[in-house]
Amino acid sequence: MTGITRRRIIAVGGVVAIGAGYSFARKFAGHFTPPPEFEPISDPAGFRRVSGGSSSLGANPFAGLDGTSEESSGLPVTEVRDSICTALYGEEPLAPGTVPVASFSDFYCPYCRVQTKELARLEDRMGDKIRVAWHELPLLGEASLLASRAALAAKRQGAYVRFQERLISTPFRANPGYLKALSEEIGISYSRLTADMSSDDVGHDIQVSAALADIFGFVGTPALVIGRTVIQGQVGAATLKRIIELERADGWSQVC
C-alpha cells in the first residue's frame, strides 16, 4: 500500500468517524437537554409560565374592530375563572395519561400557521397521549374574525379540521365568496354555515377564548396552555414534546 493511498484511507476514516461522532453527540445531547425554566403564576393559581418564541401582537384581543362589537365587550371572565379547565380543554373527559393542550391562534398570524400544523402532526403521532383544544383568538382584524367565526360554524357540521386545514394553507383572506366556495368543496351547507356564524353560540365561543387570553395575559398569537404550563409565542416540536412529558410526569391535573 502506497503512502498516498494509506493517507487517503486515514483521511476518509477520520471524516467518517467525525460524522458518526457528531451524530452520536446530537442524539446524546437530545437526551440531556436542560428542562425549560418555569415561572410560577400567582393568578390563576397552580399554573406556570415558560418563555416561547415569535408571535403576532395585537393591541387588544380584537384590534382594529369596532369597540362596540359583541366580542370586544362584556367578556365572561368570571364565568371562565370559575371553570377554567373546562373553558381551556372542553367538557369531554380525558383518558388516563392524556395531556390536554389549548391552542390559541389567528388564521392570519404567520407563526400560528406553523404552530397549528406542528400541533396537528404531533397530535396524529402521539395519539391519545395528548388532546388539542383549538381556540380562535382573532387579533388581526375583520378577516381574522370572519375566518374564526366560519371555522367555529363549520365545527357545528363536523368540519372544523377540514376548514382549518384549508384556511391556514391559503394566501386568500376570508370573504363570503371564498367561504361559499370552500363550503361547497368540502360538502357542508353554506346557508347553515352563515346562520351559525352569526349565532350567539359561536359568539360565546369566541368570547370564552378572549376571556382566557385576558386571564392568562396573552397579547399575541400563537399561545398555548399545556396542562398547567402557559406559553406565549411559537415553540418547536422538541420543546412541545418535552413539556408534554413533564406535564404527564408532574401531574398536570392537580390544577384541574
Language-model region placement:
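C-terminal cap of thioredoxin/glutaredoxin-like
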Residues: T2-S42, E184-C256
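Extracytoplasmic thiol/disulfide redox context detector
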Residues: R8-L139, Q207-A210, Q254-C256
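Conserved beta-strand positions that form and line the central face of beta-propeller blades
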Residues: I84, R166, V230
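A structure-centric signal for secondary-structure junctions around beta-strands
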Residues: T98, A147, G220-T221
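Short, flexible active-site loop motifs that bind/organize anionic cofactors or intermediates
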Residues: A102, A150-A153, S169, S183, ...
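Solvent-exposed loop/turn segments at secondary-structure junctions
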Residues: F107-P110, L137-E142, T170-R173, S199-V202, ...
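Stable alpha-helical elements in mature extracytoplasmic
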Residues: Q115-E118, L146-A150, A159, F163, ...
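Structural microenvironment flanking redox-active thiols in thiol-disulfide oxidoreductases
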Residues: E123-S183
